[in-house]
Amino acid sequence: MSSSQPHRVLREIISTKQNEIKKISAWDPLPHRGLSLRDSLKSRTFSIIAECKRKSPSAGELRADYRPVQIAKTYEELGASAISVLTDQNYFGGSLEDLKDVSSELKIPVLRKDFILDEIQIREARAFGASAILLIVRILTPEQIKSFLKLASSLGMDCLVEVHTSDEAKLALDCGAEIIGINTRDLDTFQIHQNLVEEVSAFLPPNIVKVGESGIKKRSDLDTFRKLVDAALIGTYFMEKQDIRKAWLNLF
């Protein structure tokens, strides 16, 4: 992949998402489940947010036999504190129906993972059963982050605010983020930089729930995260394995 390719892909994702937003219509919201991502992650010494996704721009198709409800139930049985569900269709093969189906079947918080650019997507997430949403600092203005945090809170949802640098982490803190995800995958290059977790987590105060994202491939990776953050979000590792239960046990 050329150095310019990742930049182009990210721009394409944002452009596609902006066009999707224009087509969002009304919906009948699911009952509010009253589940808190923050509380769930803080209830254990170290927590796992396990992810459901069919494919990704960096890895291509991850799971041909993709059954998100079945996968999510397996995660819950294994001890996940929360579930992340990709709802982007074009680049990750997800859907809002996946979010709705998973939220309806589980008793733990479910995070809508998507490229949130507009308030209507937050209301949409709530309508389809999400307990939390992902906000990516790199693609939002400070004003948007503050506004989206406030709106999500008013709807009874938490926000996982994703950062990639210490500067982005400072911005997230200034905007009022309480759960900060440190993504070791650079969105501009799609490369993994594990040292980012140590660098950025050291910058965050103890009252912030810290989540390490991306790059978990083996037990030693997870052990590193345990020393630095409160939780890990793991997706590709599980999705690439035919036997999720065995993959989980191999990590722990």
Swiss-Prot record:
List each coiled-coil range.
none
PANTHER family (UniProt xref): INDOLE-3-GLYCEROL-PHOSPHATE SYNTHASE, TRYPTOPHAN BIOSYNTHESIS PROTEIN
* Enzymatic reactions: 1-(2-carboxyphenylamino)-1-deoxy-D-ribulose 5-phosphate + H(+) = (1S,2R)-1-C-(indol-3-yl)glycerol 3-phosphate + CO2 + H2O
What is the phylogenetic placement of the source species in the record? Bacteria, Pseudomonadati, Spirochaetota, Spirochaetia, Leptospirales
Q: Name one GO biological process term.
A: L-tryptophan biosynthetic process
Q: What is its EC number?
A: 4.1.1.48
Q: What organism does this protein naturally occur in?
A: Leptospira interrogans serogroup Icterohaemorrhagiae serovar Lai (strain 56601)
Name its pathway: Amino-acid biosynthesis; L-tryptophan biosynthesis; L-tryptophan from chorismate: step 4/5
Provide the protein name: Indole-3-glycerol phosphate synthase
What does the record give under GO molecular function? Answer: indole-3-glycerol-phosphate synthase activity; phosphoribosylanthranilate isomerase activity
NCBIfam families registered for this protein in UniProt:
PRK00278.2-4, PRK13957.1
